[in-house]
């Protein structure tokens, strides 16, 4: 009964919104192709770049810092107390991981956060918290509300079908791949993510990591932009502010 009431509270997606989203995705695809062609042209005639000694020293320092931090976690695994009312987390990678510990790199890959400012939904469990502690200096995470979940999936929701990345604008695709879990439309998908159940892993795995947008001024003023984004680590319900900022 509780699940049925929660489903009723979620409004349906207007058809005109789906059409707008299709047009938006087509525009972004065209822009991506143009950017790729420009990048290929720029690469022609470029000289090889050599890594400076300072970068090797920097990487060595990052690896040492990670080893010390991970050793402390093993000795004193003080966990974060998570309120019972929260069962869903959204994790965003906000730091570069070049030169970090191999343990951190493998954990980042397992979380599917291969690109900076990419994000994924995770079900909150003791094991999840332990995993997040490993990558804590490189990600930020918290508890998204229904509005944030809905906006992320509607605007940036994608899936990989037959080696092709497609936007989630067709309920037929959702029903074909998730129908066995009782998910037959976009509204069902939003509900299953917002209120994690026994099929959460399979359903969230169907979604591609969300690639969030970065403000244009970030390339010119990286320090200022990172101040706006905030520090890595746990931020509770304040993750919703970051989602609004980057979505």
Curated annotation (Swiss-Prot):
Instruction: Choose any GO biological process term that the UniProt entry carries and state it.
Output: maturation of LSU-rRNA from tricistronic rRNA transcript (SSU-rRNA, 5.8S rRNA, LSU-rRNA)
Keyword annotations from UniProtKB, A to Z: Ribonucleoprotein, Ribosomal protein
Record-level GO cellular component terms: cytosolic large ribosomal subunit; nucleolus
Q: What GO molecular-function term can you cite, just one? A: RNA binding
Q: Does the keyword Ribosomal protein apply?
A: yes
Q: Which cysteines are joined by disulfide bonds?
A: none
Keyword Chaperone annotated: no
CDD domains (alphabetical): Ribosomal_L7_archeal_euk
| Family membership | Belongs to the universal ribosomal protein uL30 family.
What is this protein's record name? Large ribosomal subunit protein uL30
UniProt gene name = RPL7L1
């Amino acid at each position: 009964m509780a699940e049925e009431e929660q489903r009723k509270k979620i409004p349906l997606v207007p058809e005109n919104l789906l059409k707008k989203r299709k047009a938006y995705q087509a525009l972004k695809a065209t822009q991506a192709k143009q950017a790729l062609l420009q990048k290929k042209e720029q690469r022609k005639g470029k000289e090889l770049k050599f890594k400076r000694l300072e970068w090797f020293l920097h990487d060595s320092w990052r690896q040492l810092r990670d080893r010390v931090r991970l050793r402390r976690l093993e000795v004193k695994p003080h966990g974060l107390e998570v309120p019972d009312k929260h069962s869903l987390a959204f994790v965003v990678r906000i730091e570069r991981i070049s030169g970090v510990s191999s343990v951190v790199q493998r954990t980042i890959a397992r979380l599917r956060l291969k690109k900076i400012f990419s994000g994924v939904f995770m079900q909150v469990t003791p094991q999840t918290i332990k995993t997040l502690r490993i990558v804590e200096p490189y990600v930020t995470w918290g508890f998204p509300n229904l509005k944030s979940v809905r906006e992320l999936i509607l605007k940036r929701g994608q899936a990989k079908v037959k080696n092709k990345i497609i936007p989630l604008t067709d309920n037929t695709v959702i029903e074909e791949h998730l129908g066995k879990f009782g998910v037959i439309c976009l509204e069902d998908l939003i509900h299953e993510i917002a209120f994690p159940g026994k099929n959460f892993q399979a359903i969230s795995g169907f979604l591609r990591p969300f690639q969030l947008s970065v403000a244009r001024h970030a390339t010119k003023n990286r320090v200022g932009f990172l101040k706006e984004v905030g520090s890595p680590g746990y931020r509770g319900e304040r993750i919703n502010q970051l989602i609004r900022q980057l979505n």
